[in-house]
């Protein structure tokens, strides 16, 4: 019997994320010397139905310290998992879910549970002398995702007047992931010059995800700026646009309307605005175009915005129960996968598989509060997701993921860059 995969030690600590807020880091060591560690991310605009991120609510770090979550790993989770075979990912995740005993992981904290879940997978992969993407995805993990790079920031990610949260570029015309990164990096620098020319050098400050946050006042102004940056870089034929509206952030529940550019807008009117944008600009994907509880509205938007990828983030929160409802109603046609929304690796994979089985595309995503941890890069390849969004080609916590994907592509030798096949990459 091979006991080298048995979990020997689990340890957690409080560290900082890219916004200067505390988060949980977990380390797992196996009897065979395999080592895995993970730093969990945190979102700024969060879905109401996400798994609970446990915070201490004390004076330290303005109430955001995570020492209780750290203690839950060191004093509760570790005691239950030491001696378990790290390869039994689903069993390990279920043990933690049962230990927590709540629907939303609010007892132990999704940040505690996820840190251990991912660190266990990494330790098992290291024990097996396999890269994480190959350990999770097997020999069929070969698709390099098309990156959605957030180069213009608004909403909760910036301090400007933009209602929409993310304006992204996706280099579908590249021949490889490395070339895709180059196209985006060159466009990013081109856009920087455009922003400086139009708004002054002081306007090239950046938001949480590395994108520029100039004093743009309207969505059309932002899209025109983006188009000019792409044209100057010379990639008008290779790069398309994707958006994250994060519409729940500018939805007024009292009136049942959206506040766009200071005016109240109905669901139908907002869908019409999207239609106009899609007709004028090379937009191929819109994330969270409507309020997170408006399944009917999502269904209508999916039908009326023909050919456009409608991505459910706050709508689904990587939860198979909500995803199942969306599938039955035809609400959106794509799942945004954020591991910390659901709290375990196995549940994240379940959501991805449900999406694929029902003809939905998949976008693996970071959060606005990130770290140098690059786990989602491996996960995107393991799942053959075809798409990843992890910020601008700037700031170390964003480039860590892109650099890891460059390494993976090099290591695979024979791989497929999703490119124009980003919706159905295999």
UniProtKB/Swiss-Prot annotation:
NAD keyword on record: no
Q: Tell me the PROSITE patterns matching this sequence.
A: ENOLASE
Q: Which UniProt keywords apply?
A: Cytoplasm, Glycolysis, Lyase, Magnesium, Metal-binding, Secreted
Please name the Gene3D superfamilies in this protein's record: Enolase-like C-terminal domain, Enolase-like, N-terminal domain
What does the entry list as the binding residues for (2R)-2-phosphoglycerate? Answer: 165, 338, 367-368, 389
Summary of the function given for this chain in its UniProt record: Catalyzes the reversible conversion of 2-phosphoglycerate (2-PG) into phosphoenolpyruvate (PEP). It is essential for the degradation of carbohydrates via glycolysis.
Q: Would you identify the family this protein belongs to, as annotated?
A: Belongs to the enolase family.
Tell me the protein's name. Answer: Enolase
Question: Can you name the source organism?
Answer: Methanococcus maripaludis (strain C5 / ATCC BAA-1333)
């Amino acid at each position: 019997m091979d006991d080298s995969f048995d979990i020997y030690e689990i340890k957690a600590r409080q560290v900082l994320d890219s916004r200067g807020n505390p988060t949980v880091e977990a380390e797992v060591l196996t009897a065979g010397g395999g080592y895995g560690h993970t730093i969990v991310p945190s979102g700024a605009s969060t879905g109401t139905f996400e798994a609970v991120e446990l915070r201490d609510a004390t004076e330290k770090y303005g109430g955001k310290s995570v020492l209780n979550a750290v203690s839950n790993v060191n004093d509760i989770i570790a005691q239950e998992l030491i001696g378990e075979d790290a390869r039994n990912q689903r069993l390990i995740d279920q043990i933690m879910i049962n230990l927590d005993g709540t629907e939303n992981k609010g007892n132990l904290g999704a940040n505690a549970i996820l840190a251990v879940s991912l660190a266990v997978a990494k330790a098992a992969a290291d024990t097996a002398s396999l890269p994480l993407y190959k350990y999770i995805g097997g020999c069929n993990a070969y698709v390099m995702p098309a990156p959605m790079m957030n180069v213009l920031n608004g909403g909760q990610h910036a301090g400007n007047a933009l209602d929409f949260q993310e304006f992204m570029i996706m280099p579908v015309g590249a021949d490889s992931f490395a070339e895709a990164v180059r196209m985006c990096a060159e466009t990013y620098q081109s856009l920087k010059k455009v922003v400086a020319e139009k708004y002054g050098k002081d306007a090239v400050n950046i938001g949480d995800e590395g994108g520029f946050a100039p004093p743009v006042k309207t969505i059309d102004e932002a899209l025109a700026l983006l188009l000019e940056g792409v044209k100057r870089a010379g990639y008008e034929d290779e790069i398309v646009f994707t958006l994250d509206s994060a519409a729940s952030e500018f939805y007024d529940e009292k009136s049942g309307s959206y506040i766009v550019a200071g005016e109240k807008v109905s669901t139908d009117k907002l869908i019409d605005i999207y239609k106009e944008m899609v007709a004028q600009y090379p937009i191929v994907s819109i994330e969270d175009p409507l309020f997170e509880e408006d399944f009917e509205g999502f269904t209508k938007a999916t039908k009326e915005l023909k050919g456009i990828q409608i991505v459910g983030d706050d709508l689904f929160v990587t939860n198979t129960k909500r995803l199942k409802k969306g599938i039955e109603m035809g609400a959106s046609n794509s799942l945004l996968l954020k591991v910390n929304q659901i709290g375990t690796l196995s549940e994240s994979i379940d959501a991805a598989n449900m999406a694929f089985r029902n003809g939905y595309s998949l976008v693996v995503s970071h959060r606005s509060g990130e770290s140098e941890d690059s786990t989602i890069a491996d996960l995107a390849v393991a799942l053959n997701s075809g798409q990843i969004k992890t910020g601008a080609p700037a700031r170390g916590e964003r480039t860590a993921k892109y650099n890891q994907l460059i390494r993976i592509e090099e290591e695979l030798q024979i791989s497929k860059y999703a490119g124009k096949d980003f919706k159905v990459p295999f």
